[in-house]
């Protein structure tokens, strides 16, 4: 029985690696190749579009979405009256941040901006801050409470 479980887990791990490899091929090579210099801006707006398609009502649900999308472990670090700071970690982040190739986290930034905009009812904008030494990405989402969504 233990051997069967071990074999299933090994197969699952190989499957996950294939999925990760395919995902990274698309994200790290193909998309930037197609979009060129506009990659960060288009990924940001794509993230906003994803958030509109999959709106969530709480910050906890945002965190759950990141986990389900295999984007990594999202954590809220700080919140003020007009700003929210997140931190994202995952094995993929480690490999992306370590690599010398240019990587963007604008898909995630756009997603965060739109979800916070939806939840707070004000226009929001997000900024990514890769921290290579710590192998993670920090996001700052800012909003103006006077700039309400109509």
Predicted regions and their residues:
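Short terminal or interdomain "cap/linker" segment that borders an active site or interface and mediates
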Residues: 78, 86, 123-150
């Amino acid at each position: 029985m233990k051997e069967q479980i071990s074999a299933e887990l090994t197969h699952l791990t190989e499957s996950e690696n294939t999925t990760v490899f395919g995902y990274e091929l698309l994200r790290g090579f193909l998309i930037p190749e197609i979009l060129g210099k506009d990659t960060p801006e288009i990924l940001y707006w794509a993230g906003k579009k994803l958030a509109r398609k999959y709106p969530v009502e709480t910050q906890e649900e945002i965190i759950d979405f990141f986990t389900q999308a295999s984007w990594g472990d999202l954590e809220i670090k700080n919140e003020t009256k007009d700003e929210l700071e997140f931190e994202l970690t995952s094995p993929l982040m480690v490999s992306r941040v370590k690599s010398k190739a240019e990587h963007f986290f604008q898909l995630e930034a756009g997603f965060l901006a739109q979800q916070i905009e939806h939840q707070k009812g004000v226009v929001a904008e997000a900024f990514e801050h890769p921290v290579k030494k710590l192998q993670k990405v920090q996001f700052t989402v800012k909003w103006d409470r006077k700039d309400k969504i109509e």
